[in-house]
Amino acid sequence: MTRNTALSSTDPGQYLTRRLIDALIREDVAGCQSDSQAVGTATVPGSPERPATWLRWTLARGVLWLPVNPATFMQRWQWSSDALIWQPADQTEGVSEVDHYEQVLACLTANEHDDSGEQLAVYADECRTAESHAAFCQKERLRWFDEIRHQGQSWKDLSRLSERLLYFDRLAAFLDHPFYPSARAKSGFDEAALAAYAPEFAPRFQLRWLA
């Protein structure tokens, strides 16, 4: 089996896929960590060369083979970045590669009549929003950093405390939540709204208070 192992962390979709899969393992979603079996490559369909350990994760509609490496913080395993393998229960010989968060979420759906399917669809939409917003904010981060370099200034050159706080608030906004995969999503915002209100763009706008 020819496998795609070159997943780039700079691509928003692949970055989000990594965060999602690691969160599924960490939070033990559908028994991902507690009910799965750690096996060697000889047991995996196609006998891939890498990595050495895979989780045989049995789900309602089939088996998801998850390639992992040992982890040291908050979870025993983490995704190796190699493509997962989906083996449907009704087609034991028909396997397919899974390397995108939408494919992973589709594997979790029990059946078309299960309530979880709608919830997973909603979350998939949130992930798409997070991917889009991440790409847009990444462009602004590169533009802002380039502007700072050309100006030859840093936060130390800001005389007022309020200016320094806003500077660091903007800088922190480019960092993701440490654990929630799709935290980058600002639901209901398009690119114009992000530029007008999101802290990544350091906008100025009038507050409208409700008493």
Residue ranges, per PLM feature:
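Noncatalytic N-terminal accessory/assembly modules of large enzymes
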Residues: 1-210
